[in-house]
Amino acid sequence: MGASRLYTLVLVLQPQRVLLGMKKRGFGAGRWNGFGGKVQEGETIEDGARRELQEESGLTVDALHKVGQIVFEFVGEPELMDVHVFCTDSIQGTPVESDEMRPCWFQLDQIPFKDMWPDDSYWFPLLLQKKKFHGYFKFQGQDTILDYTLREVDTV
């Protein structure tokens, strides 16, 4: 395993629904996902999360709550992805489509796991139960999980 790069992922959760975005281009295109991306140099992880949410959905947030950290390894890729997962229920604005993402609300019992990253079905239930977690997923390509660990933690 080599060096890692910081990424963010923000899930907008309301009592009966979650906001996901259909990735329109680039890494993960064609999948529903939360909003996020690379943390830029000189930016805190939380600032990066806020920026990515605003760029990809038009939303601004009052408060972000860090709920998880997942390290992804993709066979053949030199860098690990160190993804910091946040959730929020306090948003301002209306979700709007961007060049990268098409936002859509989903009822919590209708989350489209078959059209999401395969690892989401492992950790999303913890997120919905307001539990904090650490995870590691090793992928072959973008569809096959070769190995993983996932555990609940008290603090992220």
UniProtKB/Swiss-Prot annotation:
Keyword Nucleus: yes
Residues reported to bind Mg(2+) 1: G36, E56, E100
Phenotypic consequence of V156A: Slightly reduces 2-oxo-dATPase and 8-oxo-dGTPase activities and increases thermolability
Activity sensitivity to pH: Optimum pH is 7.8-8.2 with 8-oxo-dGTP as substrate, and 8.0-8.5 with 2-oxo-dATP as substrate.
Binding-site list for 2-oxo-dATP: T8, N33, F35, G36, G37, K38, W117, P118, D119, D120
Effect of mutating W117Y: Enhances 2-oxo-dATPase activity and greatly reduces 8-oxo-dGTPase activity
Keywords: Cytoplasm, Hydrolase, Magnesium, Metal-binding, Mitochondrion, Nucleus, RNA-binding, Transit peptide
Expression across tissues: Widely expressed with highest expression in thymus, testis, embryo and proliferating blood lymphocytes.
Family assignment from sequence similarity: Belongs to the Nudix hydrolase family.
Cofactor annotation remark: Binds 2 Mg(2+) ion per subunit.
Reported effect, V153A: Reduces 2-oxo-dATPase and 8-oxo-dGTPase activities and increases thermolability
Binding residues for O(6)-methyl-dGMP: T8, K23, N33, W117, P118, D119, D120
Residues binding 8-oxo-dGMP, per UniProt: T8, K23, N33, W117, P118, D119, D120
Binding positions for N(6)-methyl-AMP per the UniProt entry: T8, K23, W117, P118, D119, D120
Gene encoding the protein: NUDT1
Positions of 8-oxo-ATP binding: F27, F35, G36, G37, K38, E52, E56, W117, P118, D119, D120
Protein EC: 3.6.1.56, 3.6.1.-
Effect of G48M: Loss of activity
Modification after translation: The N-terminus is blocked.
Protein's name according to its UniProt entry: Oxidized purine nucleoside triphosphate hydrolase
